[in-house]
C-alpha cells in the first residue's frame, strides 16, 4: 500500500504542477510591408509586425540576424509596431521576419517576408504578341528585353504584384500565357534582375485586352494571387472592452487551474486518510491477535501445571 501511495502522491504532484502552470506559448506574429514590398532605391521601406496586446518588445530579423528593436510605449497599447528602413539599397533587400515578447515569454518567429529594392538597373521594354488585344482562348507571349545584360526577368500584373512569373535569359525572356480568359485582362510590367531581391526600373505598362464570352475559370492562372491592398498595416489600439475581456479570460483560466489543483489535493487527502485508517485497522488487528495469543499461552501453561 505504501508504494502505491507514493506513486499516487508523485502523480498528484505532477498533475497539480502541470495544471498550475500557464500555457507557455504566444501566437505567431504577422509581418507585412506597408504599401508594397517593392521599394525604389534610396526610398524608405516600412515593415509592420503585428503581435498581441501587452507585448513589451518587438524584434525585426534580417536573413536570420537581429536587425532592429522596437518597444511600444505605454499607455498606448497597440497590437504591433512599425519598423522604418531608410535609404533602401541592395544590402537591405532580402528576407525579413519578426518576433515579440510579453513579459519574459517570446513568440514563435513570423513567416518570412521578401523585401525587394527596385530601380537598380536600366529600364526594360515589354511587348506582347500577337498583340495587346486578343480573343478569349488564344495564347499570347510577353517579351521582356533589357539591353544591359542580366540573368533573370520578372513579369507582374498590376494589382497582383505577388503573383510573380520568372524567366531566364541574358538580354530577353519570354513569358508564354494561355489559353487566356477574361481573368487575364489587365496591365503588365516587367523587371530585370541579377537576383531575387534587386530589380531594375519597371517597364512601361502593357495592357492586355481579352474579348469573348468564355468565362472558364479553370483556364485562369493557378498560382495564388494577392491584391496590392493586402500590403497594409492593420495595427489597432486596445480598447477598454478588450482589456476587460483579456482580464476575465486570464481570471477564468486561473480559477479553473486553482479548482483542478484543489480537486487533486482533496483526492490526495482522501488517499492519505484511507491509508491511515487501513494502517490503524491493521495495528488493531495485530494487537488483538497478540493479546489473544498471550491469553491462549497463559491458559495452556495453567492447564499444564494442574
Curated annotation (Swiss-Prot):
Stretches in topological domain Cytoplasmic: 279-306
Cysteine disulfide partners in this protein: 49-98, 144-190
Similarity comment: family membership: Belongs to the natural cytotoxicity receptor (NCR) family.
GO CC entries: plasma membrane
Residue intervals on the Extracellular side: 22-257
Pfam families noted in UniProt: Ig_2
Gene name of the record: NCR1
Main location: membrane
Sites where a glycan is attached: 216
Role description: Cytotoxicity-activating receptor that may contribute to the increased efficiency of activated natural killer (NK) cells to mediate tumor cell lysis.
Residues in the signal sequence: 1-21
The name this protein goes by in its record: Natural cytotoxicity triggering receptor 1
Organism annotation: Macaca fascicularis
Keywords per UniProt: Cell membrane, Disulfide bond, Glycoprotein, Immunoglobulin domain, Membrane, Receptor, Repeat, Signal, Transmembrane, Transmembrane helix
